[in-house]
C-alpha cells in the first residue's frame, strides 16, 4: 500500500512539473498555427531538446498514472479498447478513408461514406472509436476532420506504408504466437513462426518478402520510418563510436548494410574513412542505382563508398578491414545463426580490427522508462514472432560473443537511443570498459559473463567413446564441460558396429555413468555368447569350434558386455545433449599460463576458452599433434573393411547356422606361390551375431534389427594398395561405402557361397574401409601440461585385432576424470604427468595384445619395424 502511494505521488509530481515546463515552452514559441494551412500541425514539432525532454517525461509519468489508476477489474476493458482501436485503424487505412478526408475543414459522415464507397453507419462508428483515441476529430455533430495524428499519415506516405505493414503483417503474426508455440514449441526454424501461421505461408519471412511486391513496399516504408525516428536514428551510429580514432584510409565494412544509409551518415562526418557496403545481390543492385541517382550525396562521399555482393552466412571476403559494422543485423537471427555471422567475421579479423554492433540491448525490467521498455519489448516479441529470434540483454550479447570467439571491449548506450553500440574484438585482446550511461548492473553482467579460469568449462575435443565417457564422468562430478565433434552428426560416417567390454572397462563405466544411464546401458546391450567357431573359407566347413573355453574365465578375454556402438554412443549422450556441438573441428589451440586457460580455435572460425583441454579427437588428433608433436604413429601395413549384414530370412537360410552362435573366424591364407611374393599373410574375417533380448527391445524399440557385425582385415596388397589409397578421394561417404562393399566381394571371390552370403547381402551403405594404424607398445613419455592432455585413440591407436581399443579409452577417461575431480580443472603438472604414465603402462599391455593378434590374423611385422603412418 505504501509503495503504491509513493509511486502515485511521484508520478503526479512528475506530471505537474513537466506539464508546466512544456506549457512554458509552448507559450514562449514565436511560431503559431497557420489557420490557412491545409493540414493541422503538431504543436510539439521543432521543440528544443529541453522541451522534448519535458514532453517525454510527461508522457512517462502519465503512463504510470494510467497504470496505477486502472483497477484490476478494468484491465480487460482497457485491452478491449486497444484491439478495437487497432481494428478501426486498419479499416480506415485499408479502405483508404484518409484519401477522401479533406486536408482542411470538415466533411460529413454521409459525404465521406459516399466518396469512399463504404456504409455510412460503419464509417461513423469506426471514426468515433478512432476519435476516442485521438486519431480523428469531430468538432461538431456528424462532421469529421483530421487531427494532428491523422494529418501525419495524410502528409507522409511512408507513415501510411508503415501503418499498412503493421495492420496487415505485424498484427496477424503477433496474434498467432500462441498457436505457433502450441504447434512447434521452442524452435529456431524460420518457417515455423507465428508469421507463417498469421500469413498462411510455408516459407521464411524474407523469402515471402521477395515474392510479394506489396509486402516489400510496406516493409521498406516501415524501415524508412524506423531509421528516421530519432530514437532509432543514424546519428547515434555517428556519435556512439569513436570513428575519429581510426587511421586515415581505414576501411569500414557495413555488413548487411542494405542501401548504405548508415555508412553514408558516418562518411559525411568522418572524411578520412572508406566504406564497403555488403548485402545480397538484389539489394546491392538497388543500392547502387539509388546512390547513383541521389544528387544530395556529395561526390566526395560517393567516392569513398563501394558496394559488394555478400551473404553474411558465408566466409567474409574482406580481410583487411579496420571495423566491421553490423546495424540491426544480429537481432533478426537466433543464437546459432547469429554465431555463424559473427564467426565468419571473426575469421577475417586482422590484428587490432574491431566489430561494432549497433543493436538493441534489452534492459532489466523497470530500469528504464516504461514507454521505452515497451518499445524494446515490442521489438523482442516481433523478432520472436517473425524470425524465432530475439532481442538480447547484455549478458546474452556477452554469451553470444564468447560462443563466437569474441569479447565485448566497450558498451555504449546513447541517451534517447533504443539501440546500444557494442565494440567487440577477438577474445583475449580486450580490456572491458564502458561509458557513464551504463548501470552498475549492466557492467556487472559483462564482467560476470567473461568468467574466471575456475568457472570456464573443460573442453573435450571429440565425441567418440573416450570423449563422451569423460563428459559423463565430469557431469556426475558437477564439473562444467563442452564437447566438440568434427562430424556433422552422430551417424555422419560408419565407425564399426560391435564393441566388447571386459571387466576393467565395465568397472570404469560404473564409475563414470550416473546410475540411471548405467542401468540403461546394461539393458541396451546385446546378448553375449562366449565361444569361437573357425571356418575354411573355400569349402565352408568348420575347422574348429568350442563353446566357452579359452574365451571365458581367467584365461582369455573376460568378455563382460557386447555392445552396439551406435546404441552405446546414444546412451553416452543421455543428459548431456546440450553440451555437445557437432561440426566443430579444432584447427589449433594455445594455452595462456598467465590466466591458466586454454583457447581452442575451430576451422569454422569460432573460438572457445576453457580451463582444460582433453584431446579425444581420434587418429587425426590436432591436440596430439600440438601436445605431443613427435609422437610415433606407424602403418601396420593392413587394411580393414568393417561391415554389417542384417539377419534377414534370406541371410539365415544361406549362411551356416553354426557360424551365428558366437565369434566366428575365417582365415584365408595365401597360396604357396603367391606367398613367395607377398609372404604367408592371411586375410581374416571376424564376425559376431548381434542379437537383442526381448527385454532390451521392449525398453528401447529404436535398437537396430539383429545383425552380424564383421571385419575383414589383411595386408593392403590383398585389397589392392591402389584401392585402399584411392578411398579418401571419394566425394561422398555413400560412394566410399559402396566401393568398400564391392572390395569385400572381390577379396572373397573364391570363398564358399554360404560364407559369401555375408558380403552379398550386406548393407552396402554401412561398409567402410580403413588403413590400420597403431602406436608402438613402449610409448615414449612427453612433457606434460596442466591445461592439456590426450587420451584414448588420439594417443594410443591400436589394431582392432586385440579387441581392446575401446576398453583402453574408457579406462583412460575414468582415470582422467578422477584427476580433475581430485585437483580441479587446473590440476598440477605432476598430476597430469602421473595420469600420462599410468595411461602409457595400460596402453602398452593392450597394444602388445593387439600386436600378437595382428601377426596371427594378417602377418603384421613387429610394430617397431613398421614405417611411419602417412596421414
Swiss-Prot record:
Domain of life: Eukaryota
GO molecular function: monooxygenase activity; O-methyltransferase activity
Catalyzed reaction equations: nor-toralactone + S-adenosyl-L-methionine = toralactone + S-adenosyl-L-homocysteine + H(+); toralactone + NADH + O2 + H(+) = 1-(3,4,5-trihydroxy-7-methoxynaphthalen-2-yl)propan-2-one + CO2 + NAD(+)
Active site per UniProt: 331
Pathway participation: Mycotoxin biosynthesis
Keywords: FAD, Flavoprotein, Methyltransferase, Monooxygenase, Multifunctional enzyme, NAD, Oxidoreductase, S-adenosyl-L-methionine, Transferase
Region feature (O-methyltransferase): 1-429
Matches recorded under SUPFAM superfamilies: FAD/NAD(P)-binding domain, S-adenosyl-L-methionine-dependent methyltransferases, Winged helix' DNA-binding domain
InterPro entries on file: COMT-like, FAD/NAD-bd_sf, O_MeTrfase_dom, SAM-dependent_MTases_sf, WH-like_DNA-bd_sf, WH_DNA-bd_sf
GO biological process: methylation; secondary metabolite biosynthetic process
Location of region: FAD-dependent monooxygenase: 430-871
E.C. code: 2.1.1.-, 1.-.-.-
Keyword Hydrolase: no
Disruption phenotype: Abolishes the production of cercosporin but accumulates the naphthopyrones nor-toralactone and toralactone, as well as the oxidation product of nor-toralactone, naphthoquinone. Adopts a dark yellow-brown coloration, with slight export of pigmented metabolites into the agar.
Chain residues that bind S-adenosyl-L-methionine: 279
Induction: Expression is positively regulated by the cercosporin cluster-specific transcription factor CTB8. Expression is also affected by nitrogen and carbon sources and pH, and is also controlled by another transcription activator, CRG1, previously shown to regulate cercosporin production and resistance.
Binding site for FAD: 485, 569, 806
Annotated function: Dual O-methyltransferase/FAD-dependent monooxygenase; part of the gene cluster that mediates the biosynthesis of cercosporin, a light-activated, non-host-selective toxin. The perylenequinone chromophore of cercosporin absorbs light energy to attain an electronically-activated triplet state and produces active oxygen species such as the hydroxyl radical, superoxide, hydrogen peroxide or singlet oxygen upon reaction with oxygen molecules. These reactive oxygen species cause damage to various cellular components including lipids, proteins and nucleic acids.
Family: In the C-terminal section; belongs to the paxM FAD-dependent monooxygenase family. In the N-terminal section; belongs to the class I-like SAM-binding methyltransferase superfamily. Cation-independent O-methyltransferase family. COMT subfamily.
PANTHER family, alphabetized: DUAL O-METHYLTRANSFERASE_FAD-DEPENDENT MONOOXYGENASE ELCB, PUTATIVE (AFU_ORTHOLOGUE AFUA_4G14580)-RELATED
Name the UniProt record assigns to this protein: Dual O-methyltransferase/FAD-dependent monooxygenase CTB3
Amino acid at each position: 500500500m505504501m509503495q503504491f502511494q509513493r509511486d502515485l505521488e511521484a508520478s503526479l509530481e512528475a506530471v505537474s512539473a513537466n506539464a508546466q515546463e512544456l506549457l512554458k515552452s509552448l507559450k514562449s514559441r514565436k511560431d503559431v498555427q497557420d489557420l490557412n494551412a491545409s493540414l493541422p500541425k503538431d504543436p510539439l514539432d521543432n521543440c528544443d531538446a529541453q522541451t522534448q525532454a519535458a514532453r517525454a517525461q510527461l508522457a512517462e509519468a502519465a503512463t504510470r498514472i494510467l497504470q496505477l489508476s486502472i483497477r484490476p477489474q478494468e484491465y480487460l476493458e482497457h485491452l478491449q479498447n486497444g484491439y478495437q482501436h487497432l481494428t478501426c485503424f486498419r479499416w480506415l487505412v485499408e479502405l483508404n478513408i484518409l484519401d477522401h478526408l479533406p486536408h482542411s475543414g470538415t466533411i460529413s459522415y454521409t459525404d465521406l461514406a459516399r466518396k469512399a464507397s463504404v456504409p455510412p453507419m460503419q464509417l461513423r462508428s469506426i471514426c468515433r472509436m478512432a476519435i476516442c483515441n485521438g486519431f480523428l476529430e469531430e468538432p461538431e455533430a456528424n462532421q469529421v476532420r483530421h487531427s494532428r495524428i491523422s494529418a501525419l499519415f495524410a502528409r507522409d506516405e511512408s507513415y501510411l506504408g508503415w501503418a499498412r505493414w503493421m495492420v496487415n503483417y505485424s498484427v496477424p503474426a503477433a496474434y498467432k504466437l500462441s498457436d505457433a508455440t502450441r504447434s512447434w514449441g521452442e524452435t529456431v526454424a524460420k518457417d515455423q513462426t507465428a508469421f507463417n501461421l498469421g500469413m498462411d505461408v510455408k516459407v521464411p519471412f524474407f523469402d515471402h518478402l521477395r515474392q510479394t511486391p506489396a509486402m516489400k513496399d510496406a516493409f521498406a516504408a516501415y524501415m524508412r520510418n524506423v531509421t528516421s525516428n530519432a530514437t532509432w536514428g543514424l546519428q547515434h551510429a555517428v556519435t556512439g563510436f569513436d570513428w575519429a580514432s581510426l587511421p586515415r584510409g581505414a576501411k569500414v565494412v557495413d555488413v548487411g548494410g542494405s542501401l548504405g544509409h548508415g555508412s553514408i551518415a558516418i562518411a559525411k562526418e568522418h572524411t578520412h574513412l572508406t566504406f564497403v557496403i555488403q548485402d545480397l545481390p538484389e539489394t546491392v543492385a538497388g543500392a547502387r542505382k539509388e546512390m547513383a541517382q541521389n544528387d544530395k550525396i556529395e561526390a566526395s562521399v560517393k567516392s569513398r563508398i563501394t558496394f559488394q555482393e555478400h551473404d553474411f552466412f558465408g566466409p567474409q571476403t574482406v580481410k583487411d578491414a579496420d571495423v566491421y559494422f553490423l546495424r540491426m543485423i544480429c537481432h533478426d537471427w537466433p543464437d546459432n545463426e547469429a554465431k555463424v555471422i559473427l564467426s565468419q567475421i571473426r575469421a577475417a579479423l586482422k590484428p587490432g580490427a574491431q566489430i561494432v554492433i549497433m543493436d538493441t540491448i534489452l534492459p532489466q525490467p523497470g530500469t528504464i522508462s516504461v514507454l521505452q521498455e515497451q518499445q524494446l519489448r515490442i521489438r523482442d516479441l516481433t523478432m520472436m514472432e517473425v524470425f524465432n529470434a530475439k532481442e538480447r540483454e547484455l549478458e546474452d550479447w556477452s554469451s553470444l560473443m564468447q560462443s563466437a570467439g569474441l569479447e565485448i571491449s566497450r558498451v555504449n548506450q546513447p541517451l534517447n537511443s533504443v539501440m546500444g553500440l557494442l565494440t567487440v574484438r577477438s577474445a583475449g585482446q580486450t580490456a572491458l570498459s564502458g561509458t557513464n550511461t551504463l548501470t552498475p548492473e549492466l557492467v556487472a553482467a559483462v564482467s560476470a559473463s567473461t568468467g574466471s579460469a575456475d568457472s570456464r568449462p573443460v573442453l573435450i575435443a571429440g565425441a567418440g567413446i573416450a570423449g563422451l565417457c569423460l563428459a559423463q564422468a565430469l557431469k556426475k562430478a558437477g564439473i562444467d564441460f563442452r564437447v566438440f565433434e568434427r562430424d556433422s552428426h552422430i551417424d555422419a560416417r560408419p565407425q564399426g558396429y560391435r564393441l566388447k567390454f571386459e571387466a576393467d572397462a565395465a568397472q570404469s563405466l560404473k564409475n563414470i555413468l550416473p546410475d540411471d544411464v548405467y542401468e540403461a546401458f546394461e539393458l541396451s546391450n546385446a546378448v553375449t555368447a562366449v565361444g569361437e567357431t573357425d571356418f575354411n573359407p573355400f569349402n565352408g566347413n568348420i575347422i574348429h569350434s568350442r563353446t566357452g573355453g579359452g574365451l571365458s574365465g581367467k584365461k582369455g578375454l573376460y568378455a563382460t558386455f557386447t555392445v552396439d556402438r551406435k546404441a552405446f554412443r546414444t546412451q553416452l549422450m543421455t543428459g548431456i545433449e546440450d553440451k555437445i556441438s557437432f561440426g566443430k573441428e579444432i584447427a589449433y589451440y594455445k594455452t595462456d599460463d598467465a590466466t591458466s586457460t586454454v583457447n581452442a580455435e575451430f576451422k569454422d572460425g569460432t573460438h572457445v576458452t576453457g580451463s582444460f583441454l582433453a584431446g579425444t579427437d581420434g587418429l587425426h588428433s590436432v591436440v596430439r599433434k600440438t601436445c605431443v608433436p613427435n609422437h610415433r604413429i606407424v602403418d601396420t601395413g593392413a587394411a580393414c573393411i568393417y561391415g554389417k549384414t542384417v539377419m534377414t530370412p534370406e541371410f539365415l537360410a544361406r549362411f551356416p547356422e553354426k557360424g551365428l552362435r558366437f565369434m566366428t573366424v575365417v582365415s584365408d591364407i595365401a597360396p604357396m606361390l603367391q606367398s613367395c611374393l607377398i609372404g604367408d599373410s592371411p586375410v581374416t574375417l571376424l564376425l559376431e551375431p548381434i542379437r537383442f533380448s526381448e527385454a532390451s527391445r521392449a525398453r528401447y524399440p529404436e535398437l537396430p534389427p539383429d545383425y552380424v557385425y564383421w571385419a575383414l582385415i589383411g595386408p593392403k596388397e590383398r585389397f589392392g594398395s591402389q584401392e585402399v589409397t584411392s578411398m579418401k578421394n571419394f566425394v561422398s561417404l555413400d560412394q566410399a561405402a559402396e566401393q568398400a562393399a564391392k572390395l569385400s566381394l572381390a577379396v572373397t571371390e573364391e570363398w564358399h557361397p554360404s560364407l559369401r552370403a555375408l558380403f552379398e547381402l550386406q548393407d552396402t551403405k554401412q561398409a567402410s574401409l580403413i588403413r590400420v594404424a597403431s602406436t608402438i607398445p613402449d610409448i615414449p613419455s612427453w612433457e606434460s601440461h596442466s591445461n592439456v592432455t590426450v587420451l584414448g585413440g588420439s594417443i594410443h591407436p591400436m589394431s582392432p585385432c586385440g579387441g581392446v581399443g575401446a576398453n583402453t579409452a574408457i579406462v583412460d577417461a575414468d582415470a582422467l576424470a578422477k584427476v580433475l575431480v581430485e585437483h580441479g580443472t587446473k590440476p598440477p603438472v605432476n598430476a597430469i604427468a602421473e595420469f600420462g604414465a599410468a595411461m602409457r603402462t595400460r596402453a602398452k599391455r593392450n597394444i602388445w595384445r593387439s600386436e600378437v593378434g595382428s601377426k596371427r590374423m594378417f602377418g603384421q611385422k613387429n610394430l617397431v619395424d613398421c614405417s611411419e603412418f602417412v596421414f
